[in-house]
UniProtKB/Swiss-Prot annotation:
Species of the source: Homo sapiens
Protein known as: Prostaglandin reductase 3
Catalytic activity, reaction form: 13,14-dihydro-15-oxo-prostaglandin E2 + NADP(+) = 15-oxoprostaglandin E2 + NADPH + H(+); 13,14-dihydro-15-oxo-prostaglandin E1 + NADP(+) = 15-oxoprostaglandin E1 + NADPH + H(+); 13,14-dihydro-15-oxo-PGF2alpha + NADP(+) = 15-oxoprostaglandin F2alpha + NADPH + H(+); 13,14-dihydro-15-oxo-prostaglandin F1alpha + NADP(+) = 15-oxoprostaglandin F1alpha + NADPH + H(+)
Protein location: Peroxisome
Enzyme class, spelled out: oxidoreductase
Main location: other
E.C. number(s) listed in UniProt: 1.3.1.48
Gene: PTGR3
Transmembrane segments: none
PTM annotation (Phosphoserine): residues: 299
PROSITE patterns from the UniProt entry: QOR_ZETA_CRYSTAL
GO molecular function: 15-oxoprostaglandin 13-oxidase [NAD(P)+] activity; zinc ion binding
Length: 377
């Protein structure tokens, strides 16, 4: 049982465990921190979210870790969260951000059985857009070091891994279409499909991204800015594609449905083209969808990672093993090529979200949160 003991301005866990509240370099954890907070519901991230300063650093409970975030991941669905679409019952203000990687700087007594101060961990949990985040030890993932490449696996990698394994029915020789293939999750869908010995087609928005896809083994990159996707699919794949990993929505979804082979499967993991609209949806030809699916005995199925959490740890372990061994490319985009340079600090998350919705990123967008040992934040 935890016993909180007041010590001046803040409380720490029982004095015998006070050492857990010093970071691994020996500097005291500050009393205040910065974090992003959703203060109004809106799909416009800048309107919805505020950088809040002088927030109290949270205390870990008995089974928790306090993680000092070094890198956090940006996801297309961050603006769905800021718009209140995932849980309409939650009202502002609330924390935002889905994933982070950093060091354990404090922990509860039960959590200390498995973790130590200074240990590198990655996690998928709400509230990562902060300098410090409390994470249940049961859902944290130990990692060899604090590398942004490991962070790419938490949401983007596991989404591709679990959805394709559970819903894709991949096997040698099947044709797989991956939309937004050079993005955060598309890069993994592309590589995992190739490892299953499939023929992979990947859509992207530039020649540079096309070259990136080729470097990963993509059989047919399609730069939709210079080639009409529908025409390419009809001419080069007249029998259709067996599996589609779809994250764009709108017109791209319609093209993907039309390209399905007999008994083809389309997995919807998102529809980014509609997220910034008031409804969060992009128009599709829903009226003709039943007839098209019936004609081909095809299927469309959604995938939401939270519904497959029982598969998460096994997927994460396998992906991490592949990443560490060099068997999986985990491309990170830290914004070095963006007009204002690298995404550094919580305030740069606003730029990072815009960068993503402009389609500029190659790989997973990651924001670095620098830390000075002597910083008082």
């Amino acid at each position: 049982m935890l016993r909180l003991v007041p010590t001046g301005a803040r409380a720490i866990v029982d004095m015998s465990y006070a050492r857990h509240f010093l970071d691994f370099q020996g500097s005291a954890i500050p009393q205040a921190m910065q974090k992003l907070v959703v203060t109004r519901l809106s799909p416009n991230f800048r309107e919805a979210v505020t950088l809040s300063r002088d927030c109290p650093v949270p205390l870990p409970g008995d089974g928790d870790l306090l993680v000092r975030n070094r890198f956090v991941g940006v996801n297309a669905s961050d603006i769905n969260y800021s718009a209140g679409r995932y849980d309409p019952s939650v009202k502002p203000p609330f924390d935002i951000g889905f994933e982070g990687i950093g060091e354990v700087v404090a922990l509860g007594l039960s959590a200390s059985a498995r973790y130590t101060v200074g240990q590198a961990v990655a996690y998928m949990a709400p509230g990562s857009f902060a300098e410090y985040t409390v994470v249940p030890a049961s859902i944290a993932t130990p990692v060899p070091s604090v590398k942004p490449e490991y962070l790419t696996l938490l949401v983007s990698g596991t989404t591709a891994y679990i959805s394709l394994k559970e819903l894709g029915g991949l096997s040698e020789g099947k044709k797989v279409l991956v939309t937004a293939a050079a993005g955060g999750t598309g890069q993994f869908a592309m590589q995992l499909s190739k490892k299953a010995k499939c023929h992979v087609i990947g859509t992207c928005s530039s020649d540079e991204k096309s070259a990136f896809l080729k470097s990963l083994g993509c059989d047919r990159p399609i730069n939709y800015k210079t080639e009409p996707v529908g025409t390419v699919l009809k001419q080069e794949y007249p029998e259709g594609v067996d599996v589609v990993y779809e994250s764009v929505g709108g017109a791209m979804f319609d093209l993907a449905v039309d390209a399905l082979a007999t008994k083809g499967r389309l997995i919807v993991i998102g529809f980014i083209s509609g997220y910034q609209t008031p409804t969060g949806l992009s128009p599709v030809k829903a009226g003709t969808l039943p007839a098209k699916l019936l004609k081909k005995s095809a299927s469309v199925q959604g995938f939401f990672l939270n519904h497959y959490l029982s598969k998460y740890q096994a997927a994460m372990s396998h992906l991490l093993e592949m990443c560490v061994s060099g068997d999986l490319v985990c491309e990170v985009d830290l914004g070095d090529l963006s007009p204002e340079g690298r995404f550094t600090g919580l305030e740069s998350i606003f730029r990072a979200v815009n960068y993503m919705y402009m389609g500029k990123n190659t790989g997973k967008i990651v924001v670095e949160l620098p830390h000075s040992v002597n910083s008082k934040l």
